[in-house]
A protein has these predicted regions:
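A charged N-terminal "starter" segment
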Residues: 1-155, 175-176, 202, 207-211, ...
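Residue-level signal for pocket-adjacent positions within structured domains
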Residues: 6, 185, 256
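Glycine-rich tight-turn/loop motif centered on a GG-T
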Residues: 33-37, 107-108, 127-131, 170-191, ...
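Active-site beta-loop-alpha junctions enriched in small/polar residues
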Residues: 43, 69-75, 94-95, 115-117, ...
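Glycine-centered flexibility sites
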Residues: 86-88, 104, 114, 184, ...
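Short glycine-/acidic-enriched loop or helix-start segments at secondary-structure transitions
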Residues: 100-101, 122, 143-144, 167-168, ...
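C-terminal active-site-proximal or functional interface alpha/beta core segments in diverse enzymes
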Residues: 221-308
Length: 308
């Protein structure tokens, strides 16, 4: 009689051999060779739905979209699965933009981040109608020029530099020494200062070719505790509130809470571990009704590569 031991949702052992879903790993290696990376479509879909459900429960004030980072997995079949599940796509390079477009993602849910973005890349982003996150003050004139030349409206978000005053636990993102997270967040993550965001925001609001849809902040994977995310959300919410006040009561439609999780690879964490801090930190008056974008949910929401 066969002895079966379930490891998790997609892995099990049968008579001492590893099975992935209903596939014998030994048979797979015999067919395709080794090393072999195997991805479970069912597990990818389960992961995406766990995140989507958990974040939606934590944010009842408007729609929530999960935007996995394209750089985590460029395989077109995986990207098509994510698009089919209603995800967006967080991208940086022209190549990643091509992957996202070919996979069939909703263009309004394709988010272009990072510096530097060259003129050709920005022009293509405007032409395709994807969201552009402005990471530096030099990008806005290029976006304005591309929008004017194409007769289109470019939709943008402004990236605020993270600030975590007083969070002195050492950053897990920095390998060289015990660097406090509040310092690491400023040193290792890009973005615009408060004054720069306000100045760019005023310029955009006076410009008919560019539409400001919201704000972005990349939080990184500095610390595994949920307290880190509580403090990040509180700080981000307060900063967005200050910016909106300085812009005369501007109401953002989208808030992009991009970031990675400093987590162990196994076993799977509960998605609620990371969605619950949103309820504590991101509820403020200007945020009601906006769209929450959870960007860069990489490992758990995209794939579980298995090699044996």
């Amino acid at each position: 009689m066969a002895t079966t031991r379930k490891i998790d949702d997609c892995l099990s052992t049968r008579d001492g051999q590893l099975w992935i879903e209903e596939c014998d790993s030994v048979a797979l290696v015999e067919r395709f060779g080794s090393p072999l990376f195997v991805l479970s479509e069912n597990q990818i879909r389960r992961n995406v739905r766990r995140y989507q459900q958990s974040f939606q429960q934590g944010w009842p004030h408007g729609p929530v979209k999960v935007l996995p980072a394209a750089k985590a997995n460029w395989i077109s079949a995986v990207q098509r699965i994510l698009a089919d599940e209603g995800c967006g796509c967080d991208i940086y390079s022209p190549g990643e933009l091509s992957v996202a477009l070919s996979a069939g993602f909703d263009r309004e849910l394709i988010s272009v981040n990072g510096v530097p973005k060259d003129e050709d890349h920005i022009a293509r982003c405007v032409r395709e109608g994807v969201r552009i996150t402005i990471d530096s003050i030099e990008e806005l004139p290029v976006i304005e020029r591309a929008a004017s030349e194409q007769g289109r409206t470019a939709r943008v978000r402004l990236r605020l530099k993270p600030a975590l005053p007083g969070f002195t636990r050492h950053s897990h993102f920095v390998a060289e020494g015990l660097v406090p997270t509040d310092i690491a967040a400023l040193a290792y993550k890009g973005g615009l200062s408060f004054d720069q965001v306000v100045a760019l925001g005023r310029r955009i609001l006076d410009n008919g070719k560019v539409e400001l849809v919201g704000f972005h902040q990349h939080h990184g994977r500095h610390h595994p505790s949920t307290r880190y995310w509580v403090e990040q959300m509180k700080s981000f919410a307060a900063e967005v509130g200050r910016v909106c006040t300085a812009l005369g009561g501007f109401q953002p439609r989208e808030i992009d809470i991009g970031g990675g999780f400093a987590i162990r690879r196994d076993p799977f964490n509960a998605a609620t571990d990371y969605s619950e801090p949103l309820q504590l930190g991101a509820l403020f008056a200007t945020a009601r009704g906006l769209e929450l974008l959870g960007a860069r949910r990489r490992y758990r929401s995209i794939s579980r590569p298995v090699s044996y």
